[in-house]
């Protein structure tokens, strides 16, 4: 079973409450506003700030383009 992208309509970044985008290649949910990437493990998003990694400036620009 794969991550259900329909979840993106109802979940939000726990830090900024903004929209999330799914990065299928890295299995992460991206919040450009908070500059964080949340892992998706076994198709379950881990929306904990301490589990997220910080996005680089290049990554933020890539997702905002």
Curated annotation (Swiss-Prot):
Entry-linked SUPFAM superfamilies: Trm112p-like
Taxonomy, superkingdom: Bacteria
Gene3D superfamilies the record matches: 2.20.25.10
Pfam families: Trm112p
UniProt-listed InterPro entries: Trm112-like (IPR005651)
Residues annotated as signal peptide: none
Gene Ontology cellular-component terms listed: cytosol
Family as reported in the entry's similarity comment: Belongs to the UPF0434 family.
Matches recorded under HAMAP family: UPF0434
Protein name in UniProt: UPF0434 protein PSHAa1659
Organism (species): Pseudoalteromonas translucida (strain TAC 125)
């Amino acid at each position: 079973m794969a991550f259900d992208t329909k979840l993106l309509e109802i979940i939000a970044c726990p830090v900024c409450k903004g929209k999330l985008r799914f990065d299928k290649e890295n299995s992460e949910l991206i919040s450009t506003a908070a500059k964080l990437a949340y892992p998706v493990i076994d198709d379950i998003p881990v929306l904990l700030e301490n589990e997220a990694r910080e996005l680089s400036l290049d990554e933020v620009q890539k997702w905002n383009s």
